[in-house]
From Swiss-Prot:
<keyword id="KW-0964">Secreted</keyword>
<keyword id="KW-0399">Innate immunity</keyword>
<keyword id="KW-0391">Immunity</keyword>
<dbReference type="GO" id="GO:0045087">
    <property type="term" value="P:innate immune response"/>
</dbReference>
<keyword id="KW-0467">Mast cell degranulation</keyword>
<keyword id="KW-0800">Toxin</keyword>
<dbReference type="GO" id="GO:0031640">
    <property type="term" value="P:killing of cells of another organism"/>
</dbReference>
<dbReference type="GO" id="GO:0042742">
    <property type="term" value="P:defense response to bacterium"/>
</dbReference>
<keyword id="KW-1213">G-protein coupled receptor impairing toxin</keyword>
<keyword id="KW-0295">Fungicide</keyword>
<keyword id="KW-0929">Antimicrobial</keyword>
<keyword id="KW-0027">Amidation</keyword>
<protein>
    <recommendedName>
        <fullName>Mastoparan-like peptide 12b</fullName>
    </recommendedName>
</protein>
<dbReference type="GO" id="GO:0090729">
    <property type="term" value="F:toxin activity"/>
</dbReference>
<comment type="similarity">
    <text>Belongs to the MCD family. Mastoparan subfamily.</text>
</comment>
<feature type="modified residue" description="Leucine amide">
    <location>
        <position position="13"/>
    </location>
</feature>
<dbReference type="GO" id="GO:0005576">
    <property type="term" value="C:extracellular region"/>
</dbReference>
């Protein structure tokens, strides 16, 4: 998983 994936997940949360 890349940092973009984590950033997107944080936005969803």
């Amino acid at each position: 998983i890349n940092w973009k994936g984590i950033a997107a997940m944080k936005k969803l949360l």
